[in-house]
Amino acid sequence: GTAIELEEIELSDEQKARVPHLANMLAFEGDWSSDEAKEVLKTQAVLASYDADGVLNGATQIQLANAIDSLYTQGENDADEASLGAVYTDGGIQVNLWAPTAQSVSLKLFNDAKVETASYPMELDSNSGVWRYEGGIELDRQLFSQFVNLHDEDLKPEGWETHVIPTITNPEDAVIYEGHIRDFSVRDESTSAQHRGKYLAFTEQGSVPNQHLAKLVENGLTHFYVLPANDMATVEEDESQSVDLTSTVADLCRLNRQAAVCDEENADASLQSVFDSYDAIAEPQKAQALTEQMRGDDRFNWGYDPYHFNVPEGSYATDADGVTRIKEMRAMNQSLHEMGMRVALDVVYNHTNASGLNGKSVLDKVVPGYYHRYDTVTGGIVRETCCDDTEPRNRMMEKFMQDSLVMWATQYKFDSFRFDIMSQATKDTMLRLESAVKAVDEDNYFYGEGWIKEDRGYEQATQINMAGTQIGTYNDRIREAVRQGQIFSTEPSDSALAAQDNVKMSLAGTLTDYVLEDYKGTASATSNIGGYATDPA
């Protein structure tokens, strides 16, 4: 290999502001051109330290994300201005993949049987780091994962383009109902069997769940908020390779021969009947054990395990293979709109299900070491949110989020977005994302979890920092006061009375300047007891 000698320097104030959590670390610079630096990023680069006699003191791998951003996103018409993915043009289809550290990229095509039929080398634009392939319109509906033009008429339910979306004047007027697409109907016998647990359950206006929603709308409900509905990593979309409560013991044992029920229960018995046979009081461990034995093969998940961020979950479609999920998710949203509700989507950009070479890793295989947040000392991926954390401060991760949100808002008509662990991003990032979405949907509403994890020296999207931005944050003041139950105590105590004050403050919008007489008889601004908002929105 080759070596470049580095000299120790002081970071500029601008550089320190860009990476405040690195501002006090040693900094070095070398003499090489941007083209040479781009070639270094394609190699296995290592930083080594030598003593005066040339003896190696130590070596470490390098976190390259800041260098990648500097080389590929600081100019005009480079990576962060590029149109990525499959782009349909008048004459054909252009495939654009941002992979600046890749040495070569090929586009592989497959037939309906998932057998590779062709492989085409892609060309690199060295300015942007984008690899491109120009193909004809004959690529449409072929598989690389799948070429799909979301503007095609056969992917739209009848009336999709012209149906009316309800509006609300102020975000303070929103009444939001949280629901899980599968749970909404999967056990409901008034829903057609083929639609239970599916997007299309929302189109059956006569079903009990939809009648329930209609009644709520009559009484002021404005939003139906669906838990994550993009492609999940841990739900098997092929129902022949998964089980639910209507499946038999034999179905489970075909997938998991180690399950204890395989030797204990009738093979033809439904899993529901096996659960029903257990005494919940005398033998709760049996139900717990069966639940655990089903866990790897059942069809339920909340959805906080993102696999493909920009594709509807296939297990909610009547046909998981192909484009059916696109049309049926749209039909769900159209039906909810026509019932009088706006639709909010839970988005989970703060982590991925996997990284590295794991089978469910995606982003980290395209640009290794870029999309995730890394510990500055150990170099390991940070897992503060639960799993493999992403790094929204990296410019192309923010662009990925922006492109994704605009797609969900325009192509599926989601009217609001709820951000899981929103505080992992910066305040500025969230405001830029909101601006991009409002450019295509002016009354879209953002809200999310503003819990602070680790303070990294920049302005994170926390409850306090987001006050007054019109981006809402979850209120744990009233949540904890109610959940902990002290407000219902029959024994008077300072903690129970203080919890009641938190409820009162929350009912007034958790405003910082609202004057509340507390349980001690003292009137003061609620900022003294945890109020953080400057606007109830």
Where are these regions (language model features)?
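Short proline/glycine-enriched turn/loop motifs at strand-loop junctions of beta-rich domains
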Residues: 98-105
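Substrate-binding/active-site clefts of carbohydrate-active enzymes
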Residues: 182-187, 191-200, 214-222, 227-412, ...
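Acidic-and-aromatic substrate-binding clefts and catalytic sites of carbohydrate-active enzymes
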Residues: 422-428
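Conserved alpha/beta catalytic core and glycan-binding cleft of carbohydrate-active enzymes
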Residues: 434-436, 440-537
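Structural beta-strand segments of beta-rich domains
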Residues: 91-96
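Short catalytic-loop micro-motif centered on adjacent basic/acidic residues
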Residues: 416-422
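The feature marks proteins involved in alpha-glucan
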Residues: 5-90, 123, 128, 134-178, ...
